[in-house]
Each structure stands twice: as C-alpha cells, then as structure tokens.
Curated annotation (Swiss-Prot):
Chief localisation class: cytoplasm
UniProt name for this protein: Ribosomal RNA small subunit methyltransferase J
InterPro entries: 16SrRNA_methylTrfase_J, SAM-dependent_MTases_sf
UniProt: S-adenosyl-L-methionine binding residues: R108, D109, E124, R125, D178
EC number(s) reported in the record: 2.1.1.242
Record localization: Cytoplasm
Gene Ontology MF annotations: rRNA (guanine-N2-)-methyltransferase activity
GO CC list: cytoplasm
Length: 259
C-alpha cells in the first residue's frame, strides 16, 4: 500500500466547464480535493474519466475503455477459451464459473472472463481506480455489442480482504487475484500505468492475507496471477501452475468445476 492517503496525491478537475458540477460531485463522493496542488488528477471530460500525472514530463492519461483499444482487440482476437486465463479459472465446455476478481485494477482480466461468459464480481479498494472502473462500465453499457458483456460484471468498492471475510452471498466458485508486484510486464502501456498507479497503490504486502481470505471463501479454486519468475504468494503451496511467456497462474484447487 502507498504510505500516504490518495487524497494527498490526487485532485479532481473538469476538462471543460460543462463538467464542472459533475466533477465537484465526484470529488465530494471520493473525498478528494477539487482543484489545488496535487501530483495526479482525476479529470472528467468528453471522453469520460481519466487519471493523469501532472507535470511537463508526464505520460498520457489512463482511462478504462471496454469498447475500443486493447480491450476491443482482445475481445475480437484474443483466442477465446484457449487463453491461459480461461484455462486457469476453469472455463471449459459447459462450464462458465462465477468469478470474484478481488484485485480488479482497470478490469482487463475481468472483462476477458466476462467476454467468455463468466459472471464476474470486481473489487477495487483504491477509490480513484474504482472510479475509473465505474466510469468505464457506465460508458460500455451504451455500446450495443459490449453492453451484454459488461452486464455480467458487478463492481464493489472497498477492501477485498474485509469483503471476503464478511461475504453475504453464495460464495464465488473461483477467486482471481493479481497482487501488485515490483517487477511486471515491461510493455510501454504497462510502464505508463505503473508509473501512474504505483505511487497510489504501492506493492501488495497483504497478498498473503488476500490469499488466506480467498482460500476460505472460494468454493472451487483460487487463481493467483504472478510474473513468470516471481515466487508464489507466501502461504499454502499452489496445487499446480500454468506458465506463459511473462506471467504464471498459480492454481489452488478445492474441487472440480463441472457443467
């Protein structure tokens, strides 16, 4: 976790006067300042909500977009149920497990699973990032092709460990974890996002507690995404792993998923 509150780092601002009132309301809801000195800004404008680092050498802003860009490409050409993430969570003919993504981030993996037909609940504990997700989902609902997919996605703000320990509903069949890790994918897009997010989010020293809570709740399996050469999260050893070029999925199976 970051050492300081996100409120120290982030302000909310409108990119046009027409969004002034909505941006002020968002700032109030998130408990963030509207304007003033900050390192980052949640900016509300014509294209929705975006997070930007402020300053002359800053990279471009980041938005959640499930309709165009990388998400659209993966939806159309990503490989369907042959993708490693699909195999990791147990997607197979006649089986589309109910998944809890307890470290949702920008929602990319959750969107892939929803594209495959899974019902996915997302938890994101950092309010600025949860706000980006909420905005991306709201815009996606307006697209006729993507709306049926995001209808399978439900966002819950708050702390995932606390929510899992007090889960009020039927347990998810699969819980998916992707804890922040110091060494990640070195692509330009991920580098930009990490530059934006790491000061807010930090690493995840509570990953063992996340895993413990997930193992206590999931009815069928827990899946932990890791960099390929990273150690497993401290705690019980995974039953097996699926390894790709840059990532690895550690799988803690409790019972078989059946159609």
């Amino acid at each position: 976790m970051a050492d300081e509150s996100p409120a120290v780092w982030v302000r909310v601002e409108a990119l046009d006067t027409v969004f002034h009132e909505a941006a002020q309301a968002l700032a109030g809801r998130l408990g963030l300042p509207f304007g003033g000195e900050a390192r980052f800004a949640l900016q509300l404008g014509e294209q929705g909500l975006q997070l930007a680092e402020l300053g002359a050498q800053a990279p471009g802003p980041v938005r959640v977009d499930f309709v165009e860009g990388a998400s659209a490409h993966r939806r159309l050409f990503g490989g369907g149920s042959g993708q490693m993430i699909a195999k990791a969570v147990g997607v197979q003919p006649g089986v589309r497990p109910r998944v809890l993504d307890a470290t949702a981030g920008l929602g990319r993996d959750a969107f892939v699973l929803a594209c495959l037909g899974c019902e996915v609940t997302l938890i994101e504990r950092q309010p600025p990032i949860a706000a980006l997700l909420e905005d991306g989902l709201a815009r996606a609902v307006r697209d006729p092709e993507v709306a049926p997919i995001v209808a399978r996605m439900r966002l819950l703000p708050g702390d995932a460990i606390a929510r899992m320990r007090q889960w009020p509903d039927e347990p998810p069949q699969v819980i998916y974890l992707d804890p922040m890790f110091p060494h990640r994918d070195k692509s330009a897009l991920v580098k930009k996002e990490m530059r934006l997010f790491r000061p807010l989010v930090g690493d995840d020293p509570d990953a063992p507690a996340l895993l413990e809570a997930a193992l206590a709740l999931a009815s069928h399996r827990v899946v932990v995404k890791r960099p390929r050469k990273a150690p497993s999260v401290a705690g019980p050893r995974p039953g097996y792993s699926l390894e790709g070029k840059s990532s690895r999925y550690d799988i803690y199976a409790r019972q078989s998923l059946k159609g």
